[in-house]
Amino acid sequence: IPESAEAFLACDQTEQAILEELLHKYEQRRRIKLTREAGGLRLVASGRSAHGSLPEEGVNAISILLGFLRGLPLAQNAAEAARIFYMLCGEDTDGRGLRIACADEHGALTMAPTQVQLREGQIDLVLDIRFPVSKNLAWLKAHILEIIEPLGLRLTAWNGKEPHFIRPDSPLVQSLLTVYQEESGDMRPPLAIGGGTYARAIPNAVAFGPVFPGQPRLEHQAEECISIAQLLRLSKIYAAALYALANQDWPANQNIVQE
């Protein structure tokens, strides 16, 4: 989730004063810094970074900036683009703006704008969307096109992967869960996450750790770190898990994973 976004608005001194007054009325004004430069104003929005699969835990700087720009008397194309983009993805993280909000027993869809830029007269917007295991890429693409095409928008790039999902009752998950529960005392069921892990590259694999319940999620953050105590606790759990998997009596011709 981007923690910074900026825009330069070409304007004269009279227009600069008007924009400064409008910023004072914006509810997120404390997150936007306005600087006078030759030929106009530079706006820098500051948010709070978060993992792409957890947009609700961050403050998206792009959404803050779009929220301000949509109410400005900009050139027609820019004003309309800011308004439409904010309507589609600036107000929520669950896809309601694009009408793709959905959820199943393993989790809900998340969505966040991660890039927006004006170049060669074209405004590009990049979205990060993580969808539930009960949906697929074809469903997602069809629903997005249904919404954006009547607005005059085009889908110029599409890059995605189907969910990687292993059933909670599979032998692999149950073996790992048993080890974790014995070592931690935490009896909660396993969970599915929106993050893409290296497990996706291995057919018979799942992500296992390393964050314990209640701990702050520091991956991909400016202060990413892990304590020695946590590493030692993890090592104990991982060693027990490897031992359990290596000594499991797996059926001769049966995959340890039931997809």
Which residues are covered by each model-predicted region?
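A generic structural signal for short, solvent-exposed coil/turn residues
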Residues: 1, 24-26, 35-37, 105, ...
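Histidine/acidic-residue-rich, glycine-tolerant segments that coordinate divalent metal ions
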Residues: 1-58, 257-258
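Extended amphipathic alpha-helical segments enriched in small hydrophobics
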Residues: 3-6, 126, 138
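Residue-level signal for inorganic ion chemistry
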Residues: 9, 65, 127
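Short glycine/proline-enriched coil/turn segments at helix->beta-strand junctions
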Residues: 11-14, 28, 39, 73-75, ...
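Short amphipathic alpha-helices in soluble, non-transmembrane regions
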Residues: 17-29, 57-61, 68-71, 139-149
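Hydrophobic residues embedded in beta-strands of well-ordered beta-sheets
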Residues: 41-43, 121-125
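An extended, acidic, His-containing surface patch that forms the Zn2+-binding/catalytic region
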Residues: 46-49, 53-112, 117-120, 130-135, ...
